[in-house]
Curated annotation (Swiss-Prot):
Organism: Drosophila melanogaster
PROSITE patterns registered for this protein in UniProt: ANTENNAPEDIA, HOMEOBOX_1, HOMEOBOX_2
Gene for this chain: Scr
Cellular localisation: Nucleus
Annotated region described as Disordered, given as residue ranges: 24-67, 169-220, 256-304
GO BP field: anterior/posterior pattern specification; midgut development; positive regulation of transcription by RNA polymerase II; salivary gland boundary specification; sex comb development
Protein keywords: Developmental protein, DNA-binding, Homeobox, Nucleus, Phosphoprotein
Protein name in UniProt: Homeotic protein Sex combs reduced
Expression sites by tissue: In embryo, expressed in the labial and anterior prothoracic segments and the extreme posterior of the maxillary segment. In adult, expressed in the maxillary analgen of the eye and antennal imaginal disk and the labial and T1 leg imaginal disks.
Family: Belongs to the Antp homeobox family. Deformed subfamily.
């Protein structure tokens, strides 16, 4: 055996053994007419149960071997390297050596260099056929998607979109599941729907994104659904290439007054603020929307209502009589604790320290200043009451809850006598 070809299959090993024993073959069988016939795609010999191959039996080879002349050889033709009556129903007939039984080479040697190229050629041909089928099926699926998208009614699209609007990564309502012909085209159709979903995710936010950059609160829910459905349809109509172009078109359209729909759709304005909007609301809306407009072009910010804004501590309110009354500032327990600790060390604050505390506790300098003024007044009151009761100073600046050193008049009775 050739040491360079030690990695071979069991069929190839049997092939080499069969070529070494040509005398075991049946010399009475002669096939003058059936040497070249091939079985199309079966690949196996059609030997009978009794070991005799009829004259019409075929060896499923490649059909590339030369025809064996009736008088030249009494053995099997060059398309078979071993007898089918010894090894029936074996799909290895195309691994035959043409020189083994044609009388042109040594019958004891098998040319293994002819085995691998044929198998590689078969694999390459199968891969090319599969790729051609896949491309054809993808083209058919794209045409079917285009026709279905044009024929479907906008109301049906709106209803299906309302069913899928809760999940932003749901399948496209226009894309059918298995409209392609055969298994290959069905899988390609699913791949196309996955590609369209990936492209449409540019116009849709992630499930955790709670921003309202694409939805204006002044639009009704039906108009919002229509605008989202139109953006989806743009991505589905032209396949993966048209989806990217539609996403770019959406970015350009958002810079105008509204979103331009598909063919036959009406432009819907995204935001039209009324005359009663205050300047503070529009300013805060611009600040909120500036961080969300990256990559989507310039869009009008969403409406910000007064109840959305945080009410600052200490703001003045107007009562029923029209009088302005400042609300009582309520401090949290953490803020009170930090202020008490600071007052324990410093009863008077510098402006630098007051600014630091205001930033740390999310309060204003005015609130810090007023709190320390009130706390100093409270401390003076407690200190004055403690001095009247002759409480020692080592009890601390806050006084003491139980006054064990209270003065009783009977203590000075002996002085008056």
């Amino acid at each position: 055996m050739d040491p360079d070809c030690f990695a071979m299959s069991s069929y190839q090993f049997v092939n080499s053994l069969a070529s070494c024993y040509p005398q075991q073959m049946n010399p009475q069988q002669n096939h003058p007419g059936a040497g070249n016939s091939s079985a199309g795609g079966s690949g196996g010999g059609a030997g009978g149960s009794g070991g005799v191959v009829p004259s019409g039996g075929t060896n499923g080879g490649q059909g590339s071997a030369g025809a064996a002349t009736p008088g030249a050889n009494d053995y099997f033709p060059a398309a078979a390297a071993y007898t089918p009556n010894l090894y029936p129903n074996t799909p290895q007939a195309h691994y035959a050596n043409q020189a083994a039984y044609g009388g042109q080479g040594n019958p004891d040697m098998v040319d293994y260099t002819q085995l691998q190229p044929q198998r590689l050629l078969l694999q390459q041909q199968q891969q090319q056929q599969q790729q051609q089928h896949a491309h054809a099926a993808a083209a058919v699926a794209a045409q079917q998607q285009q026709q279905l998208a044009q024929q479907q009614h906008p109301q049906q699209q709106q209803q299906q979109q309302q069913a899928n609007i809760s999940c932003k990564y749901a399948n496209d309502p226009v894309t059918p599941g298995g409209s392609g012909g055969g298994g290959v085209s069905g899988s390609n159709n699913n791949n196309n729907s996955a590609n369209s979903n990936n492209n449409n995710s540019q116009s849709l936010a992630s499930p955790q994104d709670l921003s309202t950059r694409d939805i204006s609160p002044k639009l009704s829910p039906s108009s919002v659904v229509e605008s989202v459905a139109r953006s989806l349809n743009k991505g589905v109509l032209g396949g993966s290439l048209a989806a990217a172009a539609a996403a770019a078109g959406l970015n350009n359209n958002h810079s105008g007054s509204g979103v331009s729909g598909g063919p036959g759709n009406v432009n819907v304005p995204m935001h039209s603020p009324g005359g009663g909007d205050s300047d503070s609301e529009s300013d805060s809306g611009n600040e909120a929307g500036s961080s969300q407009n990256s990559g989507n072009g310039k869009k009008n910010p969403p409406q910000i209502y007064p109840w959305m804004k945080r009410v600052h501590l200490g703001t003045s309110t107007v009562n029923a009589n029209g009088e302005t009354k400042r609300q009582r500032t309520s401090y949290t327990r953490y803020q009170t604790l930090e202020l008490e600790k600071e007052f324990h060390f410093n009863r008077y604050l510098t402006r630098r320290r007051r600014i630091e505390i205001a930033h740390a506790l999310c309060l204003t300098e005015r609130q810090i200043k007023i709190w320390f003024q009130n706390r100093r007044m409270k401390w003076k009151k407690e200190h004055k009451m403690a001095s009247m009761n002759i409480v020692p100073y080592h009890m601390g600046p806050y006084g003491h809850p139980y006054h064990q050193f209270d003065i009783h008049p009977s203590q000075f009775a002996h002085l008056s006598a």
